[in-house]
């Protein structure tokens, strides 16, 4: 690594970060098993991974696992507020190029994404590990701009303005960079619902030039990280941000997918009276039969003490909704991007910063709302994200996906796919001992009776867990 090929808040935080990484390793059996299984064969030897995913203690364990099995890695955060500065310092201190500071600007955010593709030897990355598809979008938009730079002329948002400026800057410094980089990519593995939606859209438009593995829809990711992770980290973020009593409050959760289910359970477990909004009749029926009142935000916003978005969509909480809420209503997002809440519509109102990632926005009539993490992920902005154990399952899927793409890319088409069921079951199996779980074993006769092998896979691909 070149001299100081990193950007962190304070490299002196490395020792603190290392202590927490050591603890996290004891809670991440899947990643530690990957190190043990693949340390000799080194399946990622020669892999040059550009990673864009929240720089946390748990991500540090992922990065060090990728390196332990042969990969070279450069890393940036996928959110301006999610970096844990001591984790970033600990990663940088080991010689990994890492770029992230909690509270970085949008300009810095896109500069850091650019940096994960700038290797000291000048050669390109051959894999992307993404969270929200920003790194993928950077390369693909840049390669299209090298053909037609007019696509960068009219940014629609402030973030897009910085995004386009960074592409223009790189095009000027390194002509042809994006096309060369796009051609070198074997594939991308994507962590989140939002990123997967972007990849499917690229596939639909014929703009996906390499294979993409949808890690998000591995059962051991979506049914665990999205649900059980949010169940623990949502209330943690609200409490750290506000110190407000949740019991007895009325909370509205927008969306009842896996993230919404975990969020509703988190709030109801803390004693809140939870209401759900939904567009999908199946999810709405699930919410109703789980005991929640299913409402529309138009009707129910005025009753809310807390509103949480979980949808991955845009304009879920609009300005007209925010005008209806109670004074000092807490407003936050645990979906992905900050456009679930119309934060841009609040920018011309008075903001009072209470502490990092906690602001009070005041309306002309004197009503105030407490906005967490400026509408970005509150569980990472106001707290430290999901616990290590559940992230071990998600990140073990990422490791296996990167191995698949690097060693078997020719078996994948330029489309979005999920990991095979056998690997999903493997990830689950790696986490059972830590919880003291003992599996029953099918006899040969039982296995034949239900049409499987005693070793699995035990469910068809269409099975819904």
Swiss-Prot record:
Cellular compartment(s): Cytoplasm
Pathway the protein acts in: Amino-acid biosynthesis; L-homocysteine biosynthesis; L-homocysteine from S-adenosyl-L-homocysteine: step 1/1
Cofactor annotation comment: Binds 1 NAD(+) per subunit.
A GO biological process held by the record: L-homocysteine biosynthetic process
Reactions performed catalytically: S-adenosyl-L-homocysteine + H2O = L-homocysteine + adenosine
Principal subcellular localization: cytoplasm
Cofactor(s), names only, from the UniProt record: NAD(+)
Record's keyword terms, sorted: Cytoplasm, Hydrolase, NAD, One-carbon metabolism
Binding residues annotated for NAD(+), in chain numbering: 192-194, 226, 255-260, 278, 313, 334-336, 379
SUPFAM superfamilies in the cross-refs: Formate/glycerate dehydrogenase catalytic domain-like, NAD(P)-binding Rossmann-fold domains
Pfam families in the cross-refs: AdoHcyase, AdoHcyase_NAD
Enzyme class, broadest EC rank: hydrolase
Binding site for substrate: 56, 131, 191, 221, 225
A GO MF term: adenosylhomocysteinase activity
Role: May play a key role in the regulation of the intracellular concentration of adenosylhomocysteine.
Alphabetical list of PANTHER family matching this protein: ADENOSYLHOMOCYSTEINASE
Family statement drawn from the similarity comment of this UniProt entry: Belongs to the adenosylhomocysteinase family.
Protein name: Adenosylhomocysteinase
Protein's organism: Bartonella quintana (strain Toulouse)
Taxonomic classification: Bacteria, Pseudomonadati, Pseudomonadota, Alphaproteobacteria, Hyphomicrobiales
